UniProtKB/Swiss-Prot annotation:
PROSITE patterns: CHORISMATE_SYNTHASE_1, CHORISMATE_SYNTHASE_2, CHORISMATE_SYNTHASE_3. The keyword Cell inner membrane does not apply. This is Chorismate synthase. It comes from Corynebacterium aurimucosum (strain ATCC 700975 / DSM 44827 / CIP 107346 / CN-1) (Corynebacterium nigricans). It catalyses: 5-O-(1-carboxyvinyl)-3-phosphoshikimate = chorismate + phosphate.
Length: 403
């Protein structure tokens, strides 16, 4: 089974992504990964950190001459700001008798962060892990960690492209109270135009509404969330399974999206709108075609019974406003128990456009795992042979002659 994990802290020396059981022969380059990481930094409303937080990439293992080897892949993203944090984030014990060390740990970046931010991992993490301050929690819970996931997912994206010819696309539906985009669903041919939009929007009117929301929030010292949509065309029938809850592909995709920092809701297809419809209006009726079976609608978002049904996969994720609010919220100082205002770390006004790129990454990883579970293969060539045989079977299974 394809597996992935990440390690590292926001201001630590580096982030590391590890991918296991990726077949041999998948093309991948440092430029491929750098491109996806640059897309993650996109977006109107990002903070100053994006301007100098370069991604210093090193491909450590599992890749040779531009191809995966079949062995574990390790990718490191160095922190170009590490020299400023060597004392504060040192893995070695500190000598607090040293005046320079004591000074660094008593003020500025090193000062204890005892006032947890509402909406963040600070409070529960400090209690759960018995930390006296929030630094050990916020360093790992920071969305900076998603850079490692995006790096790992680049390999998965290339695998999906090589095996199925599919691409994973996202766009922003709305930011804050902006008028939501209700136009036609984009295709991968629209990706350059979407990425060229400051808010990764499909439509100029929607873009202007989103930018207006961000400008207003910035002036008011506030932050914003929003909704992103992920679309994948061309998936075969039968990825995932109905046989158990954990095998259902929609459950896996929802879990992966909910695992992104600040995501508070996930919708498959028309999702919550389906709950307001009658059954006769909610489901995608099937029609016979010369090629087999098609649908008149795609309200299910390409998933039925936990399996892909051959229609376009469509998912939405709702991101809450960033919890580091410039006009600090009320909290409790964990060192004294007294009322206080929350700590303020450098952050964005809005990170919804970037969340779409991270959502693409998680969908790509889950889909790559589903493809390998269905088709197997120790090499890319073997997986492609298995897929070709299955596609031949499906074509025959749905062949009844002219409609």
């Amino acid at each position: 089974m394809l597996r992935w994990t990440t390690a590292g802290e926001s201001h630590g020396q580096a982030l590391v992504a590890l991918i296991e059981h990726m077949p041999a022969g998948v093309p991948i380059s440092q430029d491929d990964i750098a491109l996806q990481l640059s897309r993650r930094r996109l977006g109107y409303g990002r903070g100053a950190r994006m301007k100098f937080e370069a991604d210093d990439l090193t491909l450590l293992s599992g890749i040779r001459h531009g191809l995966t080897l079949g062995s574990p892949i390790a990718i490191m993203i160095g922190n170009t700001e590490w020299p400023k944090w060597t004392t504060i984030m040192s893995p070695e014990a500190l000598d607090l008798e040293d005046p320079e060390v004591a000074k660094a740990m008593a003020s500025g970046r090193g000062a204890p962060l005892t006032r947890p931010r509402p909406g963040h991992a600070d409070f529960a993490g400090m209690v759960k892990f018995d930390h006296s301050e929030a630094r050990p929690i916020l360093e790992r819970s920071s969305a900076r960690e998603t850079a490692a996931r995006v790096a790992a997912a680049t390999v998965a994206r290339n695998f999906l492209r090589e095996t199925l010819g599919v691409e994973v696309l996202s766009h922003v539906i709305s930011i804050g109270a902006s008028a939501p985009y209700k136009g036609p669903h984009p295709s991968f041919a629209d990706i350059e135009a979407i990425d060229a939009s400051p808010v990764r929007a499909c439509d100029k009117t929607a873009e202007e509404s989103m930018i207006s929301e961000i400008e207003t929030a910035k002036k008011q010292g506030d932050t914003l969330g929003g909704i992103v949509e992920v679309i994948v065309e061309g998936l075969p029938i039968g990825l995932g399974s109905h046989t158990s809850g954990e095998d259902r592909l929609d459950a896996q995709l929802a879990a992966a999206l909910m695992g992104i920092q600040a995501i508070k809701g996930v919708e498959v297809g028309d999702g919550f709108a389906e709950a307001r419809r009658r059954g006769s209006e909610a489901h995608d009726e099937m029609v016979r075609t010369d090629e087999g079976v098609d649908r008149e609608t795609n309200r299910a978002g390409g998933l039925e019974g936990g399996m892909t049904n051959g229609q376009t996969l469509r998912l939405r994720a709702a991101m809450k406003p960033i919890s580091t609010v410039p006009r600090a919220l009320k909290t409790v100082d964990m060192s004294t128990g007294g009322s206080a205002t929350a700590i303020h770390q450098r952050s964005d006004v809005c990170a919804v456009p970037a969340a779409g790129v991270v959502a693409e990454a998680m969908v790509a990883l889950v889909l790559a795992r589903a493809v390998l579970e269905k088709f197997g293969g120790d090499s890319l060539a073997e997986t492609k042979r298995n897929i070709a045989a299955y596609q031949e079977y499906v074509a025959g299974r749905l062949e009844w002659g002219e409609a």
